[in-house]
Amino acid sequence: MVDKRIYQMRSDNRKATDIAQLIKKLIATHTTISTMESCTSGLIASMITDTEGASAIFPGGYVTYLNETKIFIGVDPKVIERYGVYSKECAEAMARTVQEKLHTDIAVGITGTTGNLDPNNADSVQGRVFFCILIHDEANCFEVNTDVTGMTRHEIKQMYAARVFDALDRLAFPDAE
């Protein structure tokens, strides 16, 4: 079971994001959000919809595990060819694609390698994830490198989802404590 409050080690004094509270703030401000996820396999979307009323702000998302699926949904294949599927450029293209398809205020794109290296993609590095939070037209892209040795795939997905929610809270509500 996914804990609604996922804590992270922080270098500042701000508390880790309470996901349910974040979603309630999005609902209260009528701020819509969509996702295109690869390495988190839909966990971010699932965690959004764990909050009652989320359907008011979450029209949907895509799980695009394969390059071909990303391209089918609308990611430009030239982005994958030029920068690789595991890149901030691909994460941004994923966010822009889902935002365009679902017409949301905020879109999240996330791609990376959570466990074993991907034999189909040369840019695969274990524990390296890229995500982009697109707020209206402003892209905020992140690279996270983590030693995932000894962690289960689910623990890794939870950790990266928490990073996304923490960044989302800071970007969407910068004045909150």
What are these regions (language model features)?
Residues 2-177:
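Short alpha-helical segments enriched in small residues
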